[in-house]
Design a protein with these regions (language model features):
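RNA-binding accessory domains that recognize and position tRNA/RNA substrates
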Residues: 1-204, 208-209, 223, 335, ...
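Proline-centered loop/turn at the N-terminus of a beta-strand
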Residues: 106, 171, 241-243, 259, ...
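Active-site glycine-centered loops adjacent to acidic/histidine catalytic or metal-binding residues
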Residues: 112, 246, 289, 331
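Beta-strand-turn-beta hairpins that frame and shape the catalytic cleft
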Residues: 166-172, 279-282, 320-325
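Residues that mark the start of a beta-strand
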Residues: 169-173, 193, 241, 284, ...
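Cysteine-nucleophile active-site neighborhood
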Residues: 213, 217-284, 292, 337-347, ...
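Catalytic beta-strand/loop cores that center a nucleophilic Ser/Cys/Thr
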Residues: 281-323
Length: 357
């Protein structure tokens, strides 16, 4: 089926549709990963976004039962140069096309993804829409310009009810802003007794659970849209150790008086170098975020910058001067990507153990 991708800036890309035969609109972003498309599709942080894969051939190893990061995809669409029709991997169960049909998702292949990525890199992320080949381009552009996307992405992907993932070790309350299953896997491997709660849970409700530590998960959207979470974090600081990842990192920054801003085209992929300022060591990290903590705004707060991105020198890590609280902008659980930084989960375990003494 013939499809085309139309950007609000007027550019049009013609290609072949795959998956469900439907039109879909979202914020168009790019991801530089060569692999990990299954985790990407099921990552709640991509809620409302159409993702362009910069690597030219996607779908090579199909879809398996193990690599999902959530039960239902939140992604709006996928853009690839070429989609693999005959995947080859011993774990393959279905093809990428079959997954998109099953989950009622729309994608487009056969377009110049290098040109699209250059547009996004130079102009910044834009709104876009995958439409049928006969759709009127001028009308679609005007629709995109006048469209305001929802700002309740966290509410869309957060759990609605609390649930437990039992373990024999330290009790961790995981606040779900759109958490990947990889975070739960890393905590479970360290025998943590995990309770997953909704993003709108209050500090008082969390403290009644008597946790040893709080994990603030990744999630989609603008961190400033989560004012209730800031009150929750302020109510927990100093009372229990806190570890924030991605959106959780940004929320800690806001809760402590810093500011955030929207990046031009974000960091998305499994090959982003980050410098640990305390250890003077570089880790290759998995990242997926369109916002960052403003480094200038850290002045006058109780936060210390601990990590920076080597590509653009933006903030990638924070630590509280007084309270047991730290966070990183990238994904130490990887899923997908390098596991250089999963030692941070061990640091969190140590922080909780020391706090109990």
């Amino acid at each position: 089926m013939k499809k085309k991708l139309i950007l609000e800036s007027g550019e049009v890309f013609h290609g072949e549709g795959f998956g469900a035969d439907l039109e879909t609109a979202g914020e168009v972003v790019f991801n530089t990963g060569m692999t990990g498309y299954q985790e990407l599709i099921s990552d709640p942080s991509y809620c409302g976004q159409i993702v362009c894969m910069t690597y030219p051939l996607i779908g090579n190893y199909g879809i398996n039962r193990d690599d999902y990061e959530s039960i239902e995809p939140a992604i709006k669409g996928l853009i690839v140069k070429e989609i693999c029709d005959l995947p080859s991997n011993f774990r393959t169960q279905i093809t990428l096309q079959e997954l998109f049909k099953k989950k009622n998702l729309s994608g487009i292949s056969g377009i110049d993804t290098r040109r699209l990525t250059r547009i996004l890199r130079n102009s910044g992320v834009v709104k876009g829409k995958i439409v049928n080949a006969d759709a009127d381009e001028n009308t679609t552009v005007e629709e995109l310009k006048s469209t305001t996307f929802p700002t309740d992405q966290v509410d869309q992907v957060s759990t609605k009810t609390s649930y437990a993932n039992p373990g024999r070790g330290l009790k961790v309350v995981l606040v779900d802003f759109g958490s990947k299953l990889g975070i739960i896997r890393e905590l479970s491997q360290r025998n943590c007794d995990i309770i997953v709660v909704s993003h709108d849970t209050t500090a008082e409700e969390i403290l009644l659970m008597d946790p040893d530590g709080i994990m603030l998960s990744n999630g989609p959207g603008d961190p400033e849209d989560n004012q209730q979470a800031l009150e929750m974090i302020r109510g927990l600081l100093g009372k229990v150790p806190i570890f924030g990842i991605c959106l959780g990192h940004q929320l800690i920054g806001l809760a402590c008086g810093a500011k955030t801003f929207k990046l031009k085209f974000g960091h998305r992929g499994g090959n982003h170098p980050v410098l640990d300022l305390e250890k003077n060591k570089v880790a290759i990290t998995s990242q997926n975020h369109g916002y960052a903590v403003d480094q200038e705004s850290l002045k006058g707060t109780d936060l210390i910058e601990t990590h920076i991105a080597l590509n653009d020198r933006t903030n990638e890590g924070l630590k509280h001067k007084i309270h047991p609280c730290f966070s990183v902008q990238y994904h130490p659980e990887a899923s997908p990507g390098p596991e250089d930084a999963n030692y941070l989960f061990d640091d969190f375990i140590t922080l909780m153990e020391d706090f109990k003494k």
